[in-house]
Amino acid sequence: MFVLPPPPPRYTIPVAYAAGASNGMAVPVVETNNVITKPEGGCPLQVGEGTYHLQDDLHLATPPPHPSEAPIINPNPLATVPTPPTSGVKLSLVNIGPRNKNPVFAMKESVLAPPFGDGNPALAAPAVKDGLKRRKPKNNIIKSSSSFVSRVITHEASTKRLNDRNPEGLFAFANINRAFQWLDLGSKQKEEPLAKILFTKAHMLSHDINELTKSASHIDVVMGSSAGDIIWYEPISQKYARINKNGVVCNSPVTHIKWVPGSENLFMAAHANGQLVVYDKEKEDALFTPEEPVKSSGQQPLQVLKSVNSRNQKTNPVALWKLANQKITQFAFSPDQRHLAVVLEDGSLRVMDYLEEEVLDIFRSYYGGLICVCWSPDGKYIVTGGQDDLVTIWSFPERKIVARCQGHNSWVSTVAFDPWRCDERTYRFGSVGDDCRLLLWDFSVGMLHRPRAHQASTRQRTSMITSNSQHASRHRADSAGNRARSDSQRTADGYDEYDQAVRHPVEPRARTALLPPIMSKEIGSDPICWLGFQEDSIMTSSLEGHIRTWDRPREGINDTYNAHASSSAISAGAGSGSAVANSARGSL
């Protein structure tokens, strides 16, 4: 009788994958599980509207290294060898069911800009044969033989859990080292992931969900990795596609990724080499050759290596822009879907009109790089955080700094506005950082104290604001023609007139208003990496995988809705004219 030999071990180096060895034999691999704790009365957040109580602490399991990775024993802290880029735990949240209440303080659809690439017929979406049925990726990730994916673990009762779940509950997607988890935060077993993907070596650094295409049967997720590869993932069908495979378009880690607002197919990825790339999830990749010559001087605020108006749109990328030689750490789309705020490791904040492919303004930090950025719900203000331990508020209509926010003792990793606590006069935002603290801030232009030294230069600054506002309101009819400038137009310092107009000098501290936090709380023992505000809660995640949720005080959220019940949504777009700027200046 012929007997087949046993299959070879799945892991070629079991000792490296196992926790250790006993008597020379490898210890069997034990899959670690998520753990949830519900502290009683622990870590409350005391704010004016009430107390935020900690609901639970979900600790994600850190996966062991892949067997192909040699274990690092006694690493040298002084070694100069570059280490692979990593990211703390970050969340992407989505609510499939209808929301009870939307934030009243939001941008009206009537002021939204046209879709990105709307004027290029080469980007027109082809007709869908199946009507409203969404296209899904082609490859089954569970049965994948790709060396990029190590394995996929799905919950044994995932189908039943999806059918029985509360439609108003939140889905969460979280990265931790080489693992990517799909969680149902509305479930009683929220610590049990619906699916967990283990990649071979790559770490997912950023991910995002397409709010336009989400439904009970379809969710589009994109995630960018430390290897530069991008995964388009549809969790319900467990299908996936690999984009920028082996760095064919851009061979650099993806530091941040977002779906382009209003688009079903396009998403934008920031790479560590200073490039912003727009991809189409349904296009094939091709080796990228710049359509415009690459300038190595680094003095241009934006080099368009491929324009969204290009007729060559058969393959990715759709557009590719070079901002700097430094790493892009994060970017954020404005609520009016026209502008883009980008922060870089070189300490600059760059505000773009990404529809016109031009940079409007460049601001600088006091020192060190900028790490995070976000827009206010009405698009009037931009908030950044960075390596100078400061949170900074910038006025977009006035093109200037408004205030520095002091309170952190280490780098600021994430800033976010709370749309349920914002109105026409007061803004609420939060920040977290490597000091393990969560800070909340209330900001109103009228409450800021202008230093006396600042008042002396009001006239000069007003003229600068007017000049910059007029410049920002101009749109070039032919971006390609205006982008080409002769050497005769350049000034003695190497920058042309356009560069000088958008580069703002650093405002001295003596002339900058300071804003203290309304709450500062140390919420853990490891750095905090992410912050999010929900209708009924505040959520954070940390470097070691702690996802904490605080319930809002009922009286606070109810008072907010009652105060706004008779008001209408904002109809004025960001930077819509001098009226916005004049009102802001009058409040100061």
UniProtKB/Swiss-Prot annotation:
Domain of life: Eukaryota
GO cellular component, one term: nucleus
Region: Disordered, residue numbers: 452-499, 569-588
Compositional bias of kind Polar residues: 455-471
WD repeats: 249-289, 323-364, 365-404, 407-451, 523-560
Listed GO biological process terms: carbon catabolite repression of transcription
Record keywords, A-Z: Repeat, Transcription, Transcription regulation, Ubl conjugation pathway, WD repeat
Presence of keyword Transcription regulation: yes
Keyword DNA-binding recorded: no
Record Pfam families: WD40
Entry function: Component of the regulatory network controlling carbon source utilization through ubiquitination and deubiquitination involving creA, creB, creC, creD and acrB. Required to prevent the proteolysis of the CreB deubiquitinating enzyme in the absence of carbon catabolite repression. CreB deubiquitinating enzyme stabilized in a complex with the CreC leads to the expression of genes such as those in the proline and quinate pathways.
Record-stated family: Belongs to the WD repeat creC family.
Record note on quaternary structure: Interacts with creB.
Protein's name in the database: Probable catabolite repression protein creC
